[in-house]
Amino acid sequence: SYDLISDGHAARWSRLANSLMLRMAVRVHFKDEALAKEYITFALDPSHGGVIETVAQEAKIRSTDKLPLMNSMLPTVEDYGECRLGATIWAYMQGYDDPRLGALFTSDSYGYFMPLPPTNNNALSSAAKTGASKPKVDAASPLFWLRASEVSFLKAEAALYKLAGGNPKALYEEGVTKSFEENGVSGVAAYLEVTDFPYDISRSMLPYNRQYSCKLSTGNVSPKWNDADSDEVKLQKIITQKYLALYPNAVEAWTEYRRTGYPYLLKPAYDKAYVSIGGEEDAITPERFRFAPAEYGTNPNMSEVPALLGGEDQGATKLWWVRNNRPKQPK
């Protein structure tokens, strides 16, 4: 009676476990293809209980009469004013005319969305906190652990690299379709025919920081699938749509960006941001968190960190599952 995820249905826990195994196996396929294929095959074998296939089977936790809870995202949105619509996801959704944008974020009285760029204190003014679009979340909103759309995108990538059966196009479009269903919006058939690219951010688009601009369309992709595209472009499409479907699971989206190099992201406003964590000037995001300073005074094993990491304890040191040929984002 206290199972807040599956309400006592053990079969749904099996689906979650196998879906998590699929996620982990796909994550390592660029580094250990044989290991990835072994566990992808196991996870997708119906005799092992199956994976999450439908919206009804997704793993989520939400407030119930048995155990009232508050969505953990809510305080960052309402109490601290720290969570607002980012210009990266806005550029994709606005460029694609994505109907999920209105399901996920608030707009002003004229129907306009007000995003914030990856910028400095100019974007942290009280006006920005008040006027920028907010995530649509309340105390009763579920916290999603793993959704059906993510499983479809995982299967699409596995099929693309011949690690599992299935048609990459069909699985990609299935992932987009499930994401629309998860967010309660229609129009997926038209969306899958869109050939437009994400918006380039110009100074006129951002009311709370008019000094920022970034060209995001160069080398980018549209939602429409093309069988004639290279596998690299197909991967970019899969991960870009997966990024949109993962919202608000920011950690998983960050992980996929680090692993694959997709989707392309808006650059930091401060062009030396990455240098400060030991990286190259043209990089976009950190690769990892550093260990807490206290660890160096209390943990005798910290001397082994450079060898285990393959680099120093810096934010720019790549983790082991990052692909060797990860593309660099065009300038």
Language-model segments: which ranges?
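Structured, solvent-exposed acidic/aromatic patches
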Residues: 1-187, 228-233
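C-terminal functional modules
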Residues: 180, 184-331
